[in-house]
């Protein structure tokens, strides 16, 4: 039998063309070891840093260490089902989370998946969690206020849209309470809020969500929760997830506020991941890039100009600036702000609000130490009404604290010193504020005006808050138009001042 090479080649060619096998060309490797949510994979030569890796059972991991012959990855989720020898595939994608208005009012985990039992989130868009912060040219200076509704903050440590203001203090000093009050006060201020809970007890997160719901704040808030029961990897990425969700609004000419509660726990989670990946430890066993961990996150909070927004939206939004304001929280140990992570975050942010245990225990809440709390850029954003009335407050408090220390040892004090001490005691009392009760700018202005003009000088210290409460009620019922005017203009003209003066004087006569 004679073989015809041409026929054979034709036959082979037709067979190959008729072959219907689907091919899946992807870089794949093998699991070498699994320990504490960290997986070593051999053979993934094309993996990118930060790439999503696919494990059996629809489990995903994040490639963090790219070494010569292996890849170190963290598992996002349950890792109990992964065993040595399993096949791992590259996905070619960087970790993405859902973004957009569909997330508002929901509680999600670090991957953007709903955990509140209210059904799926049909978000139309996703975005990568690691992004480069806007450059210098894209930014605009901070000149619009973020009203927290807290007298001590809005008068002495004002916050502007696009600022990063650190809330720092020991445990149980009211750090979360300050942040939650700031979120509650954004009602009607055209501000979308993101609350990122990192490494907290699930019960604490539930309490925060309940407080936000009762105040009607969940209507404009997204909660990203990575509780203490979640893996270190989930706690580490949750801050970036929340930031990406906030950036969606910033880049479209809207304003957003994000609270990271707290970054100390995120740093600890990152330290755990780094040590398990065998990265060399440095000071306090943190890895060498722990500064970069927080700087690349907090630099993404910025106020961007109209050109940036127009270019980003391809001309859909014109003439609008966007902002992302960050309120990171740091927990200190016994008031030690010179520890590694606190000093890092202090140097990255645009100011800090110090909360002190001694003040908190003395009943001064919020327990803000006015002497060492600063806002480096917020002064330009403060409203005229509050700025004009709060100038003397910080000075009064500073002098009071200084004199109070000496007054303990002095038996007889001259009249001017006694007057300063009395005034300081009243100012301190007046700056106290109950939780979940932020004040509108008009009532805050009235309070500051009353203390500045000496209307409280002859009121007993223990009756100061009752006087304030009564005055607010009187103004709401008898001078609603004046309050409305102050809210709208955010300034105190001569007519408004005359009416306010008359109203406070009239109320004081009736106050017993």
From Swiss-Prot:
Disulfide bonds: none annotated. The keyword Transport applies. GO terms for molecular function: ADP binding; ATP binding; proton-transporting ATP synthase activity, rotational mechanism. The keyword Lipid metabolism does not apply. It is an enzyme of class 7 (translocase). Gene3D superfamilies: 2.40.30.20, ATP synthase alpha/beta chain, C-terminal domain, P-loop containing nucleotide triphosphate hydrolases. PROSITE patterns: ATPASE_ALPHA_BETA. It catalyses: ATP + H2O + 4 H(+)(in) = ADP + phosphate + 5 H(+)(out). It is a peripheral membrane protein. The record marks 373 as: Required for activity. Its EC number is 7.1.2.2. Its main location: membrane. ATP binds at residues 169-176. One of its GO terms (cellular component) is plasma membrane. It is found in: Cell inner membrane. Keywords: ATP synthesis, ATP-binding, Cell inner membrane, Cell membrane, CF(1), Hydrogen ion transport, Ion transport, Membrane, Nucleotide-binding, Translocase, Transport. Produces ATP from ADP in the presence of a proton gradient across the membrane. The alpha chain is a regulatory subunit. F-type ATPases have 2 components, CF(1) - the catalytic core - and CF(0) - the membrane proton channel. CF(1) has five subunits: alpha(3), beta(3), gamma(1), delta(1), epsilon(1). CF(0) has three main subunits: a(1), b(2) and c(9-12). The alpha and beta chains form an alternating ring which encloses part of the gamma chain. CF(1) is attached to CF(0) by a central stalk formed by the gamma and epsilon chains, while a peripheral stalk is formed by the delta and b chains. Belongs to the ATPase alpha/beta chains family. This is ATP synthase subunit alpha. The lineage of its organism: Bacteria, Pseudomonadati, Pseudomonadota, Betaproteobacteria, Burkholderiales. The gene is atpA.
């Amino acid at each position: 039998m004679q073989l015809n090479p041409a026929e054979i080649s034709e036959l082979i060619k037709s067979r190959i063309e008729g072959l219907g096998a689907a091919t899946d060309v992807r870089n794949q490797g093998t699991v070498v070891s699994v320990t504490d949510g960290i997986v070593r994979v051999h053979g993934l030569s094309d993996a990118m840093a930060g790439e999503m890796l696919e494990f059996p059972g629809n489990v995903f991991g994040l490639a963090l260490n790219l070494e010569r012959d292996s890849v170190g990855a963290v598992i996002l989720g349950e890792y109990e089902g992964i065993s040595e020898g399993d096949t791992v595939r590259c996905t070619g994608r960087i970790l993405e989370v859902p973004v957009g208005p569909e997330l508002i009012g929901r509680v999600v985990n670090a991957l953007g998946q709903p955990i509140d039992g209210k059904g799926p989130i049909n978000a139309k868009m996703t975005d990568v969690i690691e992004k480069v912060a806007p450059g210098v040219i894209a930014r605009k200076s901070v000149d619009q206020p973020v009203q927290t509704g807290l007298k001590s903050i809005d008068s002495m440590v004002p916050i502007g849209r696009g600022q990063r203001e650190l809330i720092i203090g020991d445990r149980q000093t009211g750090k979360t309470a300050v942040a939650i009050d700031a979120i509650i006060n954004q009602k009607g201020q055209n501000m979308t809020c993101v609350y990122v809970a990192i490494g907290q007890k699930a019960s604490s997160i539930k309490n925060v969500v309940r407080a936000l719901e009762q105040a009607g704040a969940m209507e404009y808030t997204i909660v990203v929760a990575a509780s203490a029961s979640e893996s270190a990897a989930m706690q580490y990425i949750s801050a970036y997830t929340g930031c990406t969700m906030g950036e969606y609004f910033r880049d479209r000419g809207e304003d957003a506020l994000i609270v990271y509660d707290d970054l100390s726990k995120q740093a600890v989670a990152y330290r755990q991941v780094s040590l398990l990946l065998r990265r060399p430890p440095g000071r306090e066993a943190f890895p060498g890039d722990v500064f970069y961990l927080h700087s690349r996150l907090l630099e993404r909070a910025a106020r961007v100009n109209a050109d940036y927004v127009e270019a980003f939206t391809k001309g859909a939004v014109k003439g609008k600036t966007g902002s992302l304001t960050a309120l990171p929280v740091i927990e200190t140990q016994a008031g030690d702000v010179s520890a590694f992570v606190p000093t890092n975050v202090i140097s990255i942010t645009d100011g800090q609000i110090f909360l002190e245990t001694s003040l908190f225990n003395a009943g001064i809440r919020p327990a803000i130490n006015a002497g060492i709390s600063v806002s480096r850029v917020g002064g330009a954003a403060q409203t005229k009404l509050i700025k004009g009335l709060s100038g003397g407050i910080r000075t009064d408090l500073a002098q009071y604290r200084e004199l109070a220390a000496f007054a303990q040892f002095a038996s007889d004090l001259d009249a001017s010193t006694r007057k300063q001490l009395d005034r300081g005691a009243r100012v301190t009392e007046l700056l106290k504020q109950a939780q979940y009760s932020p004040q509108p700018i008009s009532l805050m202005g009235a309070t500051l005006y009353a203390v500045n003009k000496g209307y409280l000088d002859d009121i007993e210290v223990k009756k100061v808050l009752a006087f304030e409460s009564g005055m607010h009620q009187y103004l709401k019922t008898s001078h609603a138009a004046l309050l409305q005017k102050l809210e709208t203009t955010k300034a105190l003209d001569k007519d408004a001042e005359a009416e306010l003066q008359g109203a406070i004087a009239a109320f004081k006569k009736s106050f017993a």
